[in-house]
Amino acid sequence: MSKVNRNIRGFVFAAVLGLASAANAGEVVVVMAAGATAPSKDVIANVYLGRSTELKPMDLPESNPARQYFYKKATDRDAAQVKAVWSRITFTGQGKPPKELADAAAVKKAVASDPKAIGYILKADVDSTVKVILSLE
């Protein structure tokens, strides 16, 4: 087997392992403030891909496995592809990327305090301060 094929296999294995670890950690859910109106999955994808500004997206850190899982399930793109989209949008002055917060508690706090904010966390982290608007399985 060539070195390139081994590298590709290693990358694919790492990607699958990353998605599996997020899935094993728990179901990822999209949340908004308790009284907010739930948008469609398409609107959520558009917000996180910079195509819509009707909501304020919140992001978990790049190191959080739920982030990769969320982007794959919500936008059909991996986190690196989404990062490239936001690099282009930022460079051309057309927008700012989602606000990156430290952890699920920070996402819940931001979402609960702003009816236009949207974020994603593990289902196990949901409490009465936020409303689940979409489950990603």
Q: Where on the chain are the PLM-derived regions?
A:
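Flexible loop/hinge segments at secondary-structure junctions
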Residues: 25-137
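Bacterial N-terminal signal peptides that target proteins for export
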Residues: 2-12
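Sec/Tat signal peptide C-region and signal peptidase I cleavage site
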Residues: 19-25
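Hydrophobic alpha-helical segments
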Residues: 11-12, 22, 116
